[in-house]
Amino acid sequence: MMSIKAFTLVSAVERELLMGDKERVNIECVECCGRDLYVGTNDCFVYHFLLEERPVPAGPATFTATKQLQRHLGFKKPVNELRAASALNRLLVLCDNSISLVNMLNLEPVPSGARIKGAATFALNENPVSGDPFCVEVCIISVKRRTIQMFLVYEDRVQIVKEVSTAEQPLAVAVDGHFLCLALTTQYIIHNYSTGVSQDLFPYCSEERPPIVKRIGRQEFLLAGPGGLGMFATVAGISQRAPVHWSENVIGAAVSFPYVIALDDEFITVHSMLDQQQKQTLPFKEGHILQDFEGRVIVATSKGVYILVPLPLEKQIQDLLASRRVEEALVLAKGARRNIPKEKFQVMYRRILQQAGFIQFAQLQFLEAKELFRSGQLDVRELISLYPFLLPTSSSFTRSHPPLHEYADLNQLTQGDQEKMAKCKRFLMSYLNEVRSTEVANGYKEDIDTALLKLYAEADHDSLLDLLVTENFCLLTDSAAWLEKHKKYFALGLLYHYNNQDAAAVQLWVNIVNGDVQDSTRSDLYEYIVDFLTYCLDEELVWAYADWVLQKSEEVGVQVFTKRPLDEQQKNSFNPDDIINCLKKYPKALVKYLEHLVIDKRLQKEEYHTHLAVLYLEEVLLQRASASGKGAEATETQAKLRRLLQKSDLYRVHFLLERLQGAGLPMESAILHGKLGEHEKALHILVHELQDFAAAEDYCLWCSEGRDPPHRQQLFHTLLAIYLHAGPTAHELAVAAVDLLNRHATEFDAAQVLQMLPDTWSVQLLCPFLMGAMRDSIHARRTMQVALGLARSENLIYTYDKMKLKGSSIQLSDKKLCQICQNPFCEPVFVRYPNGGLVHTHCAASRHTNPSSSSPGTRT
C-alpha cells in the first residue's frame, strides 16, 4: 500500500457548542447545504450552524461554526434524517416515521402542516424527471412491508406519484431519474419505476452488516458488496469500475472524486477510484456518520462533527512526484480531468508529464522518460540545459519556473558517476536526433543542432559527419570552437563548407594532410580534397590549390580539371589553354589532361592532338633511352601513341615525321606515311624493316576502314606486290603472300592476282584463295540475279497498275465540271485522281504547289 495525504480531518462543531453539559445528547444525523450546517439529535432537536471556512497558506483550511438557531420538533423521538431542498427553502426532517417540512432559516414547520407519514427512510432524486423547478422528488421506504413510494414535495404540500412493491423488504435506497437502486434483504437490485423492470445486481446478506447504497454520479451507484468490497454499478446493471477493497465492517461510504471514502469502527480509509489502491488511513473512533454534500465530506461521532478537507489535487500530484511515484501521479492527474477546466488541465497535465519525464530520466529509465517528454511537449532545451556547455552562448533560453526538477546539472544528477553520465549523453544524442526534424524543434533548431554536434564531437560519434553534410542549423561560432577543442578538424572543415566558407574549409583540410594539425578521421583526405575541388564552383579557390594537389600527386591532382561536372564543362568555365599552361610543370598531369581533351571530350583542335602525340613520343623516347628500360610502361605509352596516330586526323603529320627521323620507331613512321597516303612506303617499312606481316595486314584494314571497297582492294594489291617483288628473303615473303591471299581472298581481284603470281605456284598452295574467290564471285553473281529479279517483279507490278488505269474509259463533255474550280472543261486535257475525280491541268498544278487548297484525292 502506497500512502498519500489526500485529506485532513478538521473539527467543525465541538461537543460543547452543540450540547453544552448534556451528557445524554447524541448526534443522529447531519445535513450541509452551502454554508448552512444542520444537526439532528436524539432528543428531537434540530440545530442550525453557519460554517465559515478560513484558508491557511501552509496547511489545510479551518472551519468555525456559529450556532444560528435550535428548535425542538415536539416529539420524544430522535431526528433520524435531514435533507435540504434549497430551491424550496425547506428542510425535510424524518422523525417518528414522519417527514416534516420546516423553514431552512427559522426551522418553523410550514403553516399547512404538510408531511409524509409512514416513512422508514428516504432519499432525494438528484436527477429529477418531473421538470418542475418548484418541487423536489422524494423516494421513501414505507413502513408498509415491501413498499416504495415516490412523492413530489412543494413548499407547503406533498403529492404521492408512484407506489412500487418489491419482492423483499427494502432496507436502503438511492434514486437517479426513473431508476431506484435498492438494497433488499438478500440482494441489490436496479428498478425502473416508470417501466416496472427490475434487474438483479448481486446477492448480499443484510443480517451480517447493514447495506450501503450511494448515488455517486449520473446513473452510477456505490454499494457495499460481500467480502469487504465497495462495488460500483450503473443503472444498466453493469460495473464500469473495478471494486475497491475496504474493511468488512464499513458503516458508511462517500465519494470525493477521485477517491472513495469508507468509515468503520476505528478508521476512515481512502481508496482511489482510478487504480483501486488504498491511499490514506485516518484514525477515527466512534464515528457513525459519513456523508458527502456537494463535494464536502462530513463525518460525525455522537458528540462532534468533522470535515474531511481534501488537499488540492495538484498538491497531491506534486507530493507523489516528490516521492518518485510517477505512475500514481499520472493516474491521479488523468483522473483530475473532470474537475478542472480543459485549458487549465492541459497546461497542468503537460507540466506533470514533463516532471515525470525528468524523474524517469534521473532514474535512467530513458524509454519511459522519452515518451513522457514527447507527450508533455517538453521544450527540449530544458533537457539540454542539464548538460553543461551544450546550449549555445547566444541562446536566450531560461529554465521553467517553478523548476521541473531539482537538479542543477548532469553532474549533480549522476553524482559524478562517469558511466551514468555517458548513458545520459547517449540518450540525449538519440533523443535530439529524433526530435530535430519534428515540430518539437520549431523555433530553436539552432540550439538543438548545436547541442547535438557537441555531443557527437565529444563522443567521437560517426553521426557527426552525417549531421554536417546534411541540412543543419549548427551555430558557426559555438560549433567551430567546440570542434577545434576536440580536434575534429575535418568536421570543422565541413562546418565551414556548410556556412559557405569553402576557402577556410580547404585550408584546414590541407593543414591536416600537411601534418600541421592531427586528425585521422579520413585516411583518404587528399583524395577528398581533390574531389571537393573538382565539384567546387569557385574558380579562384581551385586555382589557389591546383599546384598543391598536383605536387602531391600529378595523376590524382589533375582530376580537379578532368572530372569536373558535365554541366560545368559545357559552360567552359575553365579555359583549357590556361590549364595546359598551368600543367607544363607537371608532365604526367599534362598528358592526363590532354588525353581528357582529345579522347574523352573529343575536342577537334589540332594543337591538342599534336601536343599529346609529341608528349607520347617524348615519353617513348625517354623510356627507350632509360638505362633501366621499363618495358611494360614503354609498351603502354607506345601503344597509346600508335592508337592516337591511327585514330586522329587532326595532328600535324609532317611535324611528327620530322621528330621521328632517326628515332628508331618504324611502326609509328609507317602510320604517319599512311596518313599522308604514302601506302607503298608505309607497307615497305612494315614488310622490309619490321618484317611484321601481321602489322602489314592490319595496316591495310585500318587504312581502308570507312572507305570504299576499291580502296581496300588497292591496298591489299599493293601489299601483295611488295611480297611478290621480294629481295633476299624471298621465301619468307612468298609464304606471307600465300597467307595473305588465303586469309583475305575476298579483298582481291582474282583475275588480276592470277596474272601476278609466279607460274611455279601450285593450285594446291592457293586452294583456299581460289575457293574463296570462286565463292565470292558466285555470291556476287547470284546477288545480282536476285536484285535483277526483284526489279523486274516491281516493274511488272507498276506495269499492271498502269494497264488497269488505261483499261477503263473516261467520258469528258462540256458539262463535266472541274472538282477544284467547278468550271467546265474547254479542251480534252485533264488530270484524273484515284477516286475518279477530274480536274484541269492548271488546277492540279496549282494544287500541287499550294497543298493547303482542297483536293479530291491523290493525283494519278
Swiss-Prot record:
GO terms for molecular function: SMAD binding; transforming growth factor beta receptor binding. Pfam families: CNH, Vps39_1, zf-Vps39_C. The keyword Transport applies. It comes from the Eukaryota. This is Transforming growth factor-beta receptor-associated protein 1. Plays a role in the TGF-beta/activin signaling pathway. It associates with inactive heteromeric TGF-beta and activin receptor complexes, mainly through the type II receptor, and is released upon activation of signaling. May recruit SMAD4 to the vicinity of the receptor complex and facilitate its interaction with receptor-regulated Smads, such as SMAD2. Plays a role in vesicle-mediated protein trafficking of the endocytic membrane transport pathway. Believed to act as a component of the putative CORVET endosomal tethering complexes which is proposed to be involved in the Rab5-to-Rab7 endosome conversion probably implicating MON1A/B, and via binding SNAREs and SNARE complexes to mediate tethering and docking events during SNARE-mediated membrane fusion. The CORVET complex is proposed to function as a Rab5 effector to mediate early endosome fusion probably in specific endosome subpopulations. Keywords: Cytoplasm, Endosome, Protein transport, Transport. CHCR repeats lie at residues 564-728. It is found in: Cytoplasm; Early endosome. The gene is TGFBRAP1. One of its GO terms (cellular component) is membrane. Disulfide bonds: none annotated. InterPro entries: Clathrin_H-chain/VPS_repeat (IPR000547), CNH_dom (IPR001180), Vam6/VPS39/TRAP1 (IPR032914), VPS39/TGF_beta_rcpt-assoc_1 (IPR019452), VPS39/TGFA1_Znf (IPR019453).
